[in-house]
């Protein structure tokens, strides 16, 4: 019911969660773009300025989100869709580019993601495949 909704139905709370989701989705889009470029295109034709710009956008996005926490969760005292989405995206980034993600220094995101990953719903959906080799993406 509404008391368990992950996105408030209206008002400032809804706008806050939607804003956090938008930044998380935009950040993840850049993570996927860089991974795609580095995984599927020959290294000699990578467009390095574009990759560097994407990495900067990923860094800025995650750091902005890390600074956006308003308590235990991103939007305050209750877990929202923004928290779940960010935890999943953080896990994907760590699986595909662990060295890059470690250098970001986003301790609040890492802590929140770690807490969520320990819950039964997250444990039930753990990936079975091995992560991509990090040397392919660094």
Regions found by a protein language model. Give the residues of each.
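GST-like domain detector, emphasizing the conserved glutathione-binding G-site
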Residues: 1-48
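Surface-exposed helix-capping loop/turn segments at secondary-structure junctions
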Residues: 2, 67-77, 120-126
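All-alpha amphipathic helical-bundle segments outside canonical DNA-binding/catalytic cores
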Residues: 8-16, 71-82
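Alpha-helical transition-metal enzyme core signature, strongest for iron centers
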Residues: 21-28, 55-58, 93
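Short helix-capping/linker segments at secondary-structure and domain boundaries
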Residues: 29, 40-43, 93-102
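Amphipathic alpha-helical packing segments from all-alpha helical-bundle domains
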Residues: 50-68
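GST superfamily/GST-like fold recognition
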Residues: 74-98, 116
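C-terminal end-helix/capping segment
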Residues: 104-125
């Amino acid at each position: 019911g509404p008391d368990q909704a992950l996105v408030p139905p209206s008002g400032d709370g809804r706008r806050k969660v939607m804003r956090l989701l938008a930044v998380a989705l935009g950040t993840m889009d850049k993570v996927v773009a860089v991974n795609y470029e580095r995984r599927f295109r020959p290294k000699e034709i990578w467009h390095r300025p574009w990759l560097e710009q994407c990495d900067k956008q990923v860094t800025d996005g995650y750091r902005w989100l890390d600074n956006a926490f308003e308590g235990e969760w991103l939007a305050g005292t209750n877990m929202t869709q923004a928290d779940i989405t960010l935890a999943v995206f953080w896990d994907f980034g760590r699986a595909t580019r662990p060295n890059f993600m470690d250098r970001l220094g986003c301790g609040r995101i890492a802590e929140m993601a770690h807490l969520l990953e320990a819950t039964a719903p997250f444990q039930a959906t753990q990936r079975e495949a091995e992560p991509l080799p990090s040397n392919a993406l660094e």
